[in-house]
Amino acid sequence: REDSPSGLFTRDMLTQLDAVFQRMAAPLVLKLYLDDTALSAELETYMTQLCALTEKLTLVKEESMDTEVADIQERPCVRICREDGSWTGLAFHGVPGGHEFTSFVLGLYNAAGPGQTLDEETLRRVRSLPAVKMQILVSLSCTMCPELVTAAQRIAAENPLVTAEVYDLNHFPRLRERY
């Protein structure tokens, strides 16, 4: 198999992505919330190329600049949604590249099902958690962040009261300064 035409995905990445897509139990919709920045254009290109690799992913650009939903104020953003358009609780603000690409793909797998295996006790505890909105601030060069992101997304995929929103700190200095 050749590299993707855009050069975004290597042959090895395409093989690994194909294996994940084949195991996904349900289709997903990736909703993009963009602005007029170069970063938004990069996210749109990245997600367009990713969705072109499988029929299990559909891309939707949300044109509205409505900021009723707090996280949409921080653009660009991709929300992982179910086929009916309802939000799974997983979102990435920025472009999920670098070390975060794998955790983003695992988030897709966990949201679509069957997801990474959890033992019964862990599953029971995750499902009993109260409402929590996790905001995870990462650096794409961080080697420790993907494990935290994957765990948070796994919890959010399993519990409808939990959300896991990941932010690339390089592009959201207000959050970096605040926390």
Model-derived features with residue positions:
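Auxiliary Fe-S-binding modules of radical SAM enzymes
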Residues: R1-S4, L8-F9, R178
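Feature detects long, helix-prone N-terminal segments enriched in hydrophobes
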Residues: P5, F21, M65, R124-V126, ...
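Local sequence-structure signature of Cys/Sec-based thiol-disulfide redox active-site neighborhoods
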Residues: G7-Q49, L53, R127-A164
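Thioredoxin-like thiol-disulfide oxidoreductase module
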Residues: T48-D84, L161-Y179
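Long, contiguous hydrophobic alpha-helical segments, chiefly transmembrane helices and signal peptides
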Residues: V78, F92-G94, L148-A152
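Non-catalytic, surface beta->alpha helical segment in thiol-disulfide oxidoreductase systems
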Residues: I80-G115
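Long, charged amphipathic helices and adjacent flexible linkers at domain junctions
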Residues: P114-L129
